[in-house]
A protein has these predicted regions:
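Short, well-ordered coil/turn residues at beta-beta hairpins
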Residues: 3-4
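FMN-binding flavodoxin-like domain, especially the glycine-rich phosphate-binding loop
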Residues: 7-136
Length: 136
């Protein structure tokens, strides 16, 4: 299982470097790719959720697998975390208007400055399905 959060429409640097470094080895193994991102809760009020999810799946999962010659047995797309405490000043300032949108979408602030859109049960179920595929 290889995964990443999506930050500014990209995989994190560490995850991308891992894929690049082990590309050859991973291409010969059963792999599963997943991302955690905001596609399920787009912050643009005009955005269509299904369109955002399809874009994220194609761009961050299918295209990523193709780039590294992977044939994943599963692709997972999950909600992400908005942690304003770990953002740089400019990024935090830019996204400060997002907080009311998150709350309006029913996403509570779980800790000061932290909004978590992940569904832990969905992630667990996906991981169990992947495990079963690997074992078969």
């Amino acid at each position: 299982m290889i995964g990443s959060g999506i930050k500014i429409k990209k995989w994190t640097k560490e995850a991308e470097q891992f894929l690049k470094k082990f590309q050859k080895e991973l291409a010969e193994k059963k792999t599963a790719l997943f991302i955690c991102c905001g596609a399920k809760y787009p912050l643009d009020g005009k955005a269509d959720v299904e369109t955002e999810i399809e874009y994220a799946r194609k761009t961050h999962l299918e295209d990523k697998a193709a780039k590294y010659n992977l044939q994943p047995i599963a692709l997972g797309l999950f909600g992400g975390v908005y942690n304003f405490n770990k953002m740089g000043w400019l990024f935090r300032k830019t996204l400060s208007a997002v907080k009311p949108q998150l709350e309006a979408a029913g996403i509570p602030e779980t800790e000061p400055g932290l909004y978590d859109t992940r569904d832990v049960n969905s992630i667990r179920n996906w991981a169990k399905e992947v495990t079963q595929k690997v074992q078969s």
